[in-house]
Structures are given as structure tokens and as C-alpha cells.
């Protein structure tokens, strides 16, 4: 059995559903293999465990929102799927090298555009990139 297409399904599932709770059981089910085989194979294929990939995806999305959205760090934390502001801030700091607030402040100093928070809550944070492409 060629496992890569199955792993890709789980990878895509993470990309689409990063904002909700995802566990190894669900991801392995999407890939159609056992949990342990899935975890080992995913890491071999992508260089990260599924949970580390999910965390990085959430942090990348948070970076997007911090640069472009007029939302608080707490709102962004919960929008991208973290359940604790403390764990979000510490993971963000570890992966990005600065706190979410410092990251936002650095980007705000460059004068980037901000999307109103009410728009994001209406459309969802996943639409931000697609909508901005249509604005220009």
C-alpha cells in the first residue's frame, strides 16, 4: 500500500481543521491506518510529528492574524485552536522567538493593513488570505 496519499489526506485535514481539537486517533482514522503507524509514518514523511505539525500550523495562522487582523492576542489564541493563552504564548515564543504581542508590535510599526475583527468573526480566519488577494 502506498502510504503517502493517505498521509497527505491527514496533512490536508490538519490544514483545513487546525482551529478545532484534533488528536492522533482522528488523524489516523483520516489516513486509514493505526495510530502508531500513522505517527511514525507522518514524521518520516514530513519531518514533524502530526501534533508538532498541527502546533506549527496554528502558530503560522496566528502570525497571519497578528499581522493583519484587529483582534486581541487572546481572541487569536482561541481562533487558531489553542485552549490556553499561556500555552499559546509560550509555544509562540519558542517557535517564533518573540511573544505574540512583540510580534504584532513589530509588524504594526511597518504600517501593515488590519482587517476589522468583526469581519473575521463573520467570515472566519481561514478566509483572510483569499479575501486580501481580491482587495488588491
Map each language-model feature to its residues.
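Alpha-helical bundle regulatory/interaction domains
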Residues: 1-35, 44, 49, 61-136
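Short, basic-rich loop-to-helix N-cap that marks the start of a DNA-contacting helix
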Residues: 52, 56
